[in-house]
Amino acid sequence: MRDDRIPKVIHYCWFGKKEKPDLIKKCIKSWKEILIDYEIKEWNEDIFDINSNKFVKEAYEEGKYAFVSDYVRVYAIYNYGGIYLDTDVEVCKEFSEEILNNESFWGFEEKNFIATSTIGAKKRNKLIKRFLDLYENKSFIKENGDIDTTTNVYIVSNIIKELGVMLDGTYQRIDGLAVFYPQEYFSPYDYINCYSKKSENTYAIHHFYKSWLPLTTRIKGTIKKTVARIIGGNNVVKLRKLIIR
């Protein structure tokens, strides 16, 4: 393995010791079938010291494992380098040399937000470090007793914006630090309107399983997807515009 590119290691998180749903198994299977020369590493409570970080400890004790992974994914990439994938990310084709030669790579989730479902970086990347440092003195439990449900997508998008990146969904580069790809590369599924923007440039698809949400909420999402398949995603967009009016 060359030392001057992002290591061929896939990091993913699975905390809580529950059985993986079929969709998750299907996605992980796609990694193994397509990324045949990659090491795949699962981060869980047997591997990572839950008590090593206050935010992680509090989130774990609340059973909010998705928020545990918010920290652990960044910890893993910073300390070891490689590619982090959410468990509901399906890989479509092998990451190119162009992708792996970046200091770090990211993709847009929607036009105004950076995705955290697929992140790649060389070890000790400075942007990853800036992201990681935000969790060092952060509490998951607020002073009033509420939990902090600020998403890592919101957090990292603000960091990127401060660095001068335009949150407009276009390809952008910060030399020596990161490259940001359009939505079609790593997260082509439009979860708001339920249609796919997949193209020949697509490496991965984030299916937005949203395991941290209540079952009733996920069921509503499934119904919405079913309706979208029947009437078409573009028609969902039109309906939303009519409702907004």
Regions found by a protein language model. Name each.
Residues M1-S69, L85-R245:
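Glycosyltransferase-associated regions of secretory-pathway enzymes
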Residues Y71-G82:
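Small-residue hinge/turn detector
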